[in-house]
Regions:
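Hydrophobic alpha-helical segments, chiefly the membrane-spanning helices
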Residues: 155-163
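Amphipathic alpha-helical oligomerization segments
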Residues: 105, 151-154
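Conserved small/polar residues in nucleotide/adenosyl-binding loops
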Residues: 144-150
Length: 163
């Protein structure tokens, strides 16, 4: 099996790329807009290409990767915030990640990415009485032609907040 590759959206200080390296996955690119986290990853992960703001990234124009990770902003989903949910300005950036994944899948005829990993706060499960999490599950399906049972099975067995 060939080496897995990773692209990280909403990268922050490179948590997903660092975890990828520990798991034998090669980070290729990252999208982040905050200057200090970019400085951190530029120094710690010099092999990582910074592709800019997630709102302007086109998934067809970046290197195709096996895994796309994204921890879209949590402020609007958190129980500590105003709970605007996915309709909020920051947490709504989730939809840009799905767009980028869809663009890459179309450009690679469905070959890449093979995996998409979304991380967020526990409030994402209860935001708007669970309807935001239902949107998180169904939106990628409508874009990428995955099957909902596969996503739900993965969610139950691996990504439960109670695991």
């Amino acid at each position: 099996m060939s080496e897995l590759t990773l692209g990280s959206l909403f990268d922050g200080s490179g948590g997903f790329p660092l975890a990828g390296i520990q798991a034998g996955i090669r980070p290729v690119w990252a999208s982040e807009i905050e200057p200090f986290p970019i400085l951190v990853t530029t120094r710690r992960l010099p092999q990582l290409t910074h592709v800019g703001d997630v709102t302007t990234v086109n998934g067809a124009d970046v290197d195709a990767v096996d895994v796309i990770t994204f921890g879209s902003p949590c402020q609007d989903l958190s129980v500590a915030g105003k709970q605007a949910g996915l309709a909020g300005e920051r947490s709504g950036l989730f939809f840009h990640a799905v767009r980028i994944i869809d663009q890459m899948r179309k450009a690679t005829h469905g070959m890449f990415p093979r995996y998409a990993i979304w991380e967020n706060v526990p409030g994402a499960f209860s935001s708007h009485k669970g309807s935001d999490f239902a949107t998180v599950l169904t939106t990628p399906v409508s874009y990428t032609h995955l099957t909902l049972p596969t996503i739900l099975r993965s969610c139950r067995s691996r990504w439960s907040p109670y695991h």
